[in-house]
């Protein structure tokens, strides 16, 4: 069953054009045209001439740019932004609606946080500040909880990832995403760098592989 992308409050969408993004194995369908961004180099690894991950997540309505026409591909993702994206992914795959009400409070992300808490993606007191930059491990944890569509394409264990062990925080989620071909780690060392922050382009790569199974990567 294909799901329609749920559009959240405050997101900016352009005219529909769904012809340029197809994945018969995906639960997602494209709903937004892609025109590029002023600061996104289409010849870079994330660009439409290479992996095209920013284009994919924008077309699917999971991520969007800023009103000044930029995307900030090398800017870091905050926890609140990650929670918003996880809520959209989960709602899309489960045919649910993210509801907005005055009781949500004054922060733009409150409805998304409430949705994620209700659906056990995160707990209400899991993070001390949602304005903090998300780590790579936290991103793995959040998106592993947002969807369960993780068919194994890489038969690997913890010994494949040099800086993650069974005792590492969010170890199970990190390994699950490696095994699913959603995470690949450093091309040379295979390291995941779980404590590092993550850029918007890197997050787009993870999210596009979550949404589009045919883009997942077999590494062994």
Locations of regions flagged by a protein language model:
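A short amphipathic alpha-helical interaction element
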Residues: 54-57, 86, 116, 174-178
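Single conserved hydrophobic/aromatic residue that forms the stacking wall/gate
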Residues: 1-16
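Non-catalytic cell-wall polysaccharide-engagement segments
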Residues: 200-202, 207
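Feature responds to low-complexity, polar/acidic, surface-exposed segments characteristic
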Residues: 15-49, 64-83, 87-137, 145-172, ...
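Structural detector for helix-capping/boundary residues
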Residues: 7-10, 80, 137, 201
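Alpha-helical membrane segments in multi-pass integral membrane proteins
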Residues: 169-179, 204
């Amino acid at each position: 069953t294909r799901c329609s992308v749920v559009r959240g409050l405050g997101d900016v969408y352009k005219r529909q054009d769904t012809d340029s993004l197809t994945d018969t194995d995906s639960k997602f369908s494209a709903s937004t045209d892609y025109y590029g961004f002023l600061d996104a180099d289409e010849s870079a690894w994330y660009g439409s001439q290479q992996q095209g991950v920013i284009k994919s997540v924008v077309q699917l309505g999971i991520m969007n740019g800023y009103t000044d026409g930029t995307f900030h591909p090398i800017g870091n993702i905050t926890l609140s932004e990650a929670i918003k994206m996880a809520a959209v992914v989960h709602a899309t795959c489960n045919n649910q609606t993210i509801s907005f009400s005055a009781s949500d409070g004054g922060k733009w992300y409150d409805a998304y946080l409430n949705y994620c808490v209700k659906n056990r993606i995160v707990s209400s007191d899991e993070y001390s500040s949602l304005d903090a930059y998300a780590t790579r491990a936290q991103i793995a944890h959040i998106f592993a909880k947002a969807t369960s569509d993780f068919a194994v394409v890489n038969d690997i264990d913890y010994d494949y990832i040099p800086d993650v062990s069974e005792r590492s925080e969010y170890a199970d989620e990190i390994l699950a995403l490696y095994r699913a071909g959603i995470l690949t780690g450093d091309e040379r060392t295979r390291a995941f760098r779980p404590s590092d922050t993550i850029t918007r382009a890197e997050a787009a790569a993870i999210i596009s592989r979550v949404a589009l199974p045919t883009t997942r990567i077999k590494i062994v």
